[in-house]
Amino acid sequence: RGLGDVYKRQILAVIALPLLYFFVLPSHAKTRIDVFLNPNLDPRGSGYNVLQSKLAIGSGKLLGMGIKNGSQTQLGYLYPQTTDFIYSAIGEEMGFIIAALVIVLYLILITKAIYVAKTARDDLGSYISAGIAGIFLFHMVENIGMTMGLLPITGVPLPFVSYGGSSLLTNFI
């Protein structure tokens, strides 16, 4: 195994990806990828939620439109606003400052969990705390990223904020 072997594998992987896309993926999977890359391809279908989400976040501006005053959230243009797109509702109704504060609070929580992982007395406590920090970080990045159109829509809840009993209960445990 040399460095040349790694390069060969990387080149084969790069060549394989387009081949997989064109010859292996079913049409609905291709559509999901295409709409993720450009939501305007299907603005009333697969791209609808992300376009409405971005519009909601952008219309909130710095201070927001006020609680229960957001046009996208209150008029029903943003459907799963209490679960998948809760961050869009926060951005529209409460504005950039509160939306940024939500991110800061998550980063504080994750930083504290990493601190606990570093100062734990045994390996098990360290692994559990680091794992919890990783889960919160993943959920935060995935949910906020999908509401901004940076990541594909997956349905991952925003911890402690999204509506849903099982997710909230799991986060508290």
Q: What residue spans do the PLM features occupy?
A:
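Hydrophobic, glycine- and aromatic-enriched re-entrant/interface helices and adjoining loop segments
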Residues: 11-100, 121-125
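Short aromatic-rich membrane-water interface segments that cap or initiate transmembrane helices
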Residues: 39, 156-166
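Loop-to-helix entry and N-terminal half of a specific, functionally important transmembrane alpha helix
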Residues: 116-154, 161
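Hydrophobic alpha-helical transmembrane segments of membrane transport and translocation systems
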Residues: 148, 165-173
